UniProtKB/Swiss-Prot annotation:
Pfam families on file: Ribosomal_L6 (PF00347)
Keyword RNA-binding (UniProt): yes
Highest taxon of the lineage: Bacteria
Subunit structure: Part of the 50S ribosomal subunit.
Lineage: Bacteria, Bacillati, Cyanobacteriota, Cyanophyceae, Gloeobacterales
Function: This protein binds to the 23S rRNA, and is important in its secondary structure. It is located near the subunit interface in the base of the L7/L12 stalk, and near the tRNA binding site of the peptidyltransferase center.
PROSITE patterns (UniProt xref): RIBOSOMAL_L6_1
Family: Belongs to the universal ribosomal protein uL6 family.
Record keywords: Ribonucleoprotein, Ribosomal protein, RNA-binding, rRNA-binding
One GO CC annotation: cytosolic large ribosomal subunit
Protein name: Large ribosomal subunit protein uL6
Length: 191
C-alpha cells in the first residue's frame, strides 16, 4: 500500500465533493475544481472522508495511487484555503506592476512583457522596493501569486520565472522567494 495513497482526506464542512465514476468534482468557498482520475485509481467516500484506493497491484496502479490521493487532497485544500507562491524580481530597473488583470514586467529587455492573468489567479504586488536577500546589493520587488488551483499557480510562477531566470553572478532576475541562488565569484583580473 502506498504510504501517501492510504491516508484519508478529510472533507471540511464548507466543501462539497461529487464522485461520478472516475471524475471528482470539489466545490468550496474559493471555487470549483474537477479531475478525471486514471483507470487504476478510484475514490470512495466513507464517514465524511475520502479514501483513494487502487484497482490492481500493477506497477502503474501503485504509481498512480499516491498521485491520485495527492491531487484530490490538493483540490480540497485549494477550494478551502488556496495556494500562494511568493516571488521576487531583483535588478536595476527591474519592476513588476499590476493593471487590472494584466501583469507588466520590466526585466531589462527593450520592451515590457505583459502577461494576462488566467481565471482564478490573483497577484498581489508590494509597491515598495526592498533589498533582496541572496543577491549582491540588489533592490527589487516582492509579489505573490494566489489561486485555488495549485497546478495553475505553479505554471504561472514558472512562466514568469522563465522570463528572466536569476543569473549566477549578482543574482539579478526573477526567482521564487524560497529559492537559493549560489552566487559565483567574478573574474579575478590580471595579476
Amino acid at each position: 500500500m502506498s504510504r501517501i495513497g492510504k491516508l484519508p482526506i478529510a472533507i471540511p464542512p464548507k466543501v462539497e465533493v461529487t464522485l461520478d465514476g472516475r471524475r471528482v468534482v470539489v466545490k468550496g468557498p474559493k471555487g470549483t475544481l474537477d479531475l478525471t482520475l486514471p483507470d487504476s485509481v478510484e475514490v470512495v467516500r466513507e464517514d465524511g472522508r475520502l479514501l483513494v484506493t487502487r484497482r490492481g497491484e500493477s506497477r502503474r496502479a501503485r504509481e498512480q495511487h499516491g498521485l491520485g490521493r495527492t491531487l484530490v487532497a490538493n483540490m480540497v485544500t485549494g477550494v478551502t484555503t488556496g495556494f500562494t507562491k511568493p516571488m521576487q524580481i531583483a535588478g536595476v530597473g527591474y519592476r513588476v506592476a499590476l493593471t487590472g488583470r494584466k501583469l507588466t514586467i520590466n526585466a531589462g529587455f527593450s520592451h515590457p512583457i505583459e502577461i494576462e492573468l488566467p481565471a482564478g489567479i490573483d497577484i498581489e504586488v508590494d509597491p515598495k522596493a526592498s533589498a533582496i536577500a541572496g543577491t549582491r546589493n540588489q533592490q527589487g520587488f516582492n509579489f505573490v501569486i494566489k489561486g485555488f488551483d495549485k497546478q495553475a499557480v505553479g505554471d504561472l510562477a514558472a512562466k514568469i520565472r522563465d522570463i528572466r531566470p536569476p543569473e549566477p553572478y549578482k543574482g539579478k532576475g526573477i526567482r521564487y522567494t524560497a529559492e537559493k541562488i549560489l552566487l559565483k565569484a567574478g573574474k579575478s583580473g590580471k595579476k
